[in-house]
Each structure stands twice: as structure tokens, then as C-alpha cells.
Amino acid sequence: MASSSVPPATVSAATAGPGPGFGFASKTKKKHFVQQKVKVFRAADPLVGVFLWGVAHSINELSQVPPPVMLLPDDFKASSKIKVNNHLFHRENLPSHFKFKEYCPQVFRNLRDRFGIDDQDYLVSLTRNPPSESEGSDGRFLISYDRTLVIKEVSSEDIADMHSNLSNYHQYIVKCHGNTLLPQFLGMYRVSVDNEDSYMLVMRNMFSHRLPVHRKYDLKGSLVSREASDKEKVKELPTLKDMDFLNKNQKVYIGEEEKKIFLEKLKRDVEFLVQLKIMDYSLLLGIHDIIRGSEPEEEAPVREDESEVDGDCSLTGPPALVGSYGTSPEGIGGYIHSHRPLGPGEFESFIDVYAIRSAEGAPQKEVYFMGLIDILTQYDAKKKAAHAAKTVKHGAGAEISTVHPEQYAKRFLDFITNIFA
């Protein structure tokens, strides 16, 4: 892992939008040693290398100025850019020419704060070691080395949708005090390498950074074409769907109070999505089997050329993390209390924010991870055309997934309400 500061090179930086505001009062946070150097990490993929470099540069720049007292409309249009042109610039680790852009830096800084994520922890979790690829996702999907964050490669249309809804999303997060089942959006970036633009969206991982998921479902409340393919089912951890959930007689066993709180939160979130005419979202359900999870696993032999943390991101064995509270940052997962090791099925609720443990006396000892995903699809002309085509194919009364936002929400809530025992 290489580390250095930016050398004299053709590096141009620009910030669009308002300058820094005044300091503002926020909750007490642990103190960190601010790193003055921008770290550069070796990454097999130039795109990932530039992304890591860009995030480190961005967080370092933000750390030099206090957060604004309040966000202004211009903050939701702002961006910061940097362009590097030098064939000697970190040539072992990075391409010689690249551009990096962060969208709405002050807005996402504020969102990270509201979600209880310190900027230095965010930086460490993303960049201490390169992220790993996760299989079986639409588009490119990366998981941070400590498994607390996911980096999803999205389209320029997704970025445009995020931009148009970001102000509403931020207002909603303020209103609900960050207590939501919606994705926690933490950063939005564009990376340009070899004249090709890639767009990256960083979110909190809905699954645990330490409890492996043994089964997962993507639930929409539709029964047409909602069964995992044979190709999907043979994967180590297939993404199962609505029909699979029903066919397996799967149920979620949580206490009545937890169920009440969850459904209230879900209804509130779905009402927000309906207001924005958003649909086609899913409930992502991950299930950790506590008995299975407490069984010792065979350790794989370590190769001589492996680094200290090899960044493997299979869903079956997260790396061990050392707790550190108050000095050098250990990343988002580094808050684990070192004086009390977590037992089987235990989790820190402020890290694994989507987790709910099964009720006492439930037939299965499990931990459930439940959150809303794919919330960027708005009901537009393309959706209307798809709905018309599916109606012709399946009939007007069929349980097809492409319907109006209000219909989608009602069907979705009806289905999810019935997944509980």
C-alpha cells in the first residue's frame, strides 16, 4: 500500500457552488488525527484506484473548512472537481490522466453526519484497503474492505434522478432524524479514466459487517416473473424473490413491538416515495442463522503473497476488526467495544442499523436485515409504456410489477405486512 502527498504536477481543481459557511453546533464526536497527506492505494483496477484517491482528496479538502451553519439551495447544485495531467503522477498506482468529481459535497457531508458517520471513519472504511467486487448484482457493485459500505456503479440517468430528488431526500432525513429504512446515501462521484465517465454512489451496507447472511430475498410484492432463475439458485448466496419466499413458507419471526416499529417506519418511507412518484423499489431481506453462524468455519490457508488484509468480500467471512475509540480512526466498524466481545447473533445497533433479532421463543434463532433498495426509478413515459406492454401480455388484473406508484405502494405494503409470522 503506497502513500504519498500530491507532487508538483498539472493538477487543476475547481469548486462549483458556494464557498464554506460558518461552523455549526453538532453532537460530540470522537477526535481524530487529521491526516494531511492524500493517500494513494495500489488497486488492480485504475478506476478503483482513482476513486480511492479522489475520496481521500475530497475528505481531506472538506476537513480544512468548517461545515456550513445551514445548507442553501446552491449546495444541492454544487460540485468539486479535480483534473490530473502528468505521466509521472503516481504512475505505479494511477493512470497518468484522470478526472474526479464529487457532487454536492456539503450535502453529503451533512447526510453522513446525520447518519452518525464520521468523515474520517468514512475515509478509512473506503480507502484503507481496496474494496472487493460482489457478485450477482446489476451493474458493478463493490463492498468496502470492512464491509460497512457499498459502492454501486450507476448510470448518468441515476445521477440525474439523485440530483433532482436530493433536496427532498435530505429534508426527509432531517425530518425523521435519520431513522429510516431508505438507503443511506453517503457520497456521489464521477470518475473519468481514458475519456470514459463512471458514476459511483456510496451507501451504508444494509447487511452486517460481521454477521454473515445465509439467505437473502428481493421482495417487491409482485408474483409475475418474481422467481429466481435456475442460474441464480445455484449460486452460493442466491438472490431469491417473492415466489421463492412463498414457496419456501419463509417467515420473519420478530417481536410484536419490533414489528410495529418496523411497519410504521416502512409506511412512512413508502409514503415519501409515493410523493416523489418513485416505484419499483424492493425490500432487501437478509437472514443470519445464529446457530449456523456460531459454528466454527475451516480457515483457508494463507498464501505467502497475501497482504495483511486481503480485502476478500465474499458474504461468508468478514475480516476481524479492532476497536478504537478516540484516537486514530478504525473505520465505521471500529466502534466495537473491545472490553465486551460480541457473542453469537449480537450486533451493535448503531453500526448494523437495519438489523432486528428474532423474538424470544421463535422457532428459528435469526437476525434479519431489512431495508428498501432501488429507490431511483420514477414513474415516467418509459414506465407507462412498460405497463401497457405487460398489461397486454398478462391481462389487466395480473400482479405485474410495473404499475402506478400508488398501486405499487399498496401492493408492496400488503405483501410485506404478511411476511411476518
UniProtKB/Swiss-Prot annotation:
Residues modified to Phosphoserine: S26, S349
Modified residues (N-acetylalanine): A2
Region (Required for interaction with PIP5K1A): 69-75
Compartments, record wording: Endoplasmic reticulum; Cytoplasm
Cited SMART domains: PIPKc
Enzyme kind, highest EC tier: transferase
UniProtKB keywords: Acetylation, ATP-binding, Cytoplasm, Endoplasmic reticulum, Kinase, Lipid metabolism, Nucleotide-binding, Phosphoprotein, Transferase
Known role: Phosphatidylinositol 5-phosphate 4-kinase with low enzymatic activity. May be a GTP sensor, has higher GTP-dependent kinase activity than ATP-dependent kinase activity. PIP4Ks negatively regulate insulin signaling through a catalytic-independent mechanism. They interact with PIP5Ks and suppress PIP5K-mediated PtdIns(4,5)P2 synthesis and insulin-dependent conversion to PtdIns(3,4,5)P3.
Protein name, as recorded: Phosphatidylinositol 5-phosphate 4-kinase type-2 gamma
Organism, scientific name: Homo sapiens
Taxonomy of the source species: Eukaryota, Metazoa, Chordata, Craniata, Vertebrata
Gene that this sequence comes from: PIP4K2C
